[in-house]
Amino acid sequence: METSDGGFRKTTLWKGGKQRIGNRELLGSKTLFRKQLWWFQGIAYDIPIVKHAKVDRALRKLTVNKRAQTIIGIKRSGRYMPMIRRMLEEEGLPLDLAYMVAQESNFNEMARSRMNAVGLWQFIASTGRRFGLNINRWIDERRDPLLSTQAAMRYLKHLYGIFEDWPLAMAAYNCGERRVQELSLIHI
């Protein structure tokens, strides 16, 4: 089924009332993480693209001011994107979530932020442990691309369960669920 919404073409991913992703039938609405595809300029997206002046400025910053860094990230992405997209597909999560890694770490598994977030998915230690990563003086699984991607999927599912909206879940991943909840209360 296809509908039009705000200049985007929307395609649902199930037919006949059965909730499906690929050949898998899903049980319960909470397990259906990929509900539709959004088509914009001939490209399919799991999460709608919002045209906004701030988004345009951020894109300009990446393509002009930080062009060299962006190119490095694109080159690194070839090592990780196939694995990340395959894992997202297997979990029924939007494939567009793979692009979060570009924002979080520029596809650098050794990245460390000023807030001590580490790895591709930039987990702080407490959140990493909360979602199953071993972090101690001998091992730091935040730097393991496979294990950190599995933990990121658990965390993103958790956030989607709270917010039931991918843009909000992504914002909460970046700045914390409490911060997004507080801002949601202010702007409701």
Predicted regions mapped to residue ranges:
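Short, functionally critical alpha-helical segments immediately adjacent to catalytic or ligand/cofactor-binding
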Residues: 93-109, 169-175
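Catalytic and binding regions of secreted/periplasmic enzymes and modules that target cell-wall glycans
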Residues: 157-182
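Soluble non-cytosolic domains of exported or imported proteins
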Residues: 64-79, 91, 95, 118, ...
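Conserved small/polar residues in nucleotide/adenosyl-binding loops
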Residues: 186-188
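Solvent-exposed, polar/charged alpha-helical surfaces in well-ordered, non-transmembrane soluble domains
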Residues: 75, 82, 86, 98, ...
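An acidic, Gly/Ser/Thr/Pro-rich helix-cap/linker signature
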Residues: 1-91
